[in-house]
């Protein structure tokens, strides 16, 4: 089998959280294009249904849509159970749902802090362990989490201590699970994107001054595109990455290099 053929995901069942838009939507489309059947999970069920239909029509993937609040353990467990029952297995997952709150630390409320931690870190824990239990029983599986370059550096000029802390936690949680499950057939990795120009970011007028500053600071002088994460995610979800576990892959246009 050639290298291109080995990157195919034919017959695999994969779910993506936060898949109704942005990085999650791009990931789901990539998995489906590579041959996988994909479950589109999001708290926004209308958006998830729309993306599931769009991807199914474009690729022939057997898609389903699932509503899930990743901070609710019972919803996460139900999501994973439904996906495993629908496809008869769970080969890989991309735990991607997340939010950012920009606020000076001295002004951030406990509620704001807790919301960021609950979604970005506890949500990843709940999804990873729920998927992990299925995969451990199978004896195989690949878990991919979304961390961030913000887990490696302190972003400026926007103050976002809660986001930074949550993403640093995702990175070490990923490594911890990778070590625990390494000999049980389950791989766990994360990606750490830099500034990615999703539609939600690029269409917000209030973010234009920040985007200009980010572009000026970055070595490439631009934001990344969701599509520029697709090949890495397909690699991590598939069998060619069989020796890759515990990795935190930074994709930031060299932003963290200085």
Could you tell me what each predicted segment is?
Residues 104-105, 112-117, 214:
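Substrate-binding pocket helix/loop in short-chain dehydrogenase/reductase
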Residues 89, 94, 182, 187, ...:
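Short, small/polar-rich loop/turn modules that mediate ligand/substrate recognition or access, typified
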Residues 218-229, 240:
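A conserved structural motif in NAD(P)-dependent oxidoreductases
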């Amino acid at each position: 089998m050639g290298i291109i053929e080995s990157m195919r995901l034919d017959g695999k069942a994969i779910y993506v959280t936060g898949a109704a838009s942005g990085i999650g939507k791009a990931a789901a489309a990539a998995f489906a294009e590579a041959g996988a059947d994909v479950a589109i999970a999001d708290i926004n069920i209308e958006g998830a249904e729309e993306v599931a239909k769009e991807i199914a029509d474009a690729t022939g993937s057997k898609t389903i849509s699932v509503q899930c609040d990743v901070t609710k353990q019972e919803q996460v467990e139900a999501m994973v159970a439904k996906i495993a029952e629908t496809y008869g297995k769970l080969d890989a997952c991309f735990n991607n749902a997340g939010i950012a709150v920009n606020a000076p630390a001295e002004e951030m409320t406990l509620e704001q802090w807790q919301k960021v931690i609950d979604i970005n870190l506890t949500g990843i824990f709940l999804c990873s362990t729920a998927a992990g239990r299925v995969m451990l029983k199978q004896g195989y599986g690949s878990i991919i989490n979304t961390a961030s370059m913000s887990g490696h550096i302190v972003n400026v000029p926007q103050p976002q201590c809660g986001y930074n802390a949550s993403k640093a936690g995702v990175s070490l949680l990923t490594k911890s699970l990778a070590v625990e499950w390494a000999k049980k057939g389950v791989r766990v990795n994360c990606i750490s994107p830099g500034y990615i120009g999703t539609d939600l970011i690029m269409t917000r007028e209030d973010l234009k001054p920040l985007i200009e500053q980010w572009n000026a600071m970055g070595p490439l002088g631009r934001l990344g595109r969701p599509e520029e994460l697709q090949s890495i995610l397909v690699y991590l979800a598939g069998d060619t990455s069989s020796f890759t576990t515990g990795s935190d892959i930074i994709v930031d246009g060299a932003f963290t290099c200085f």
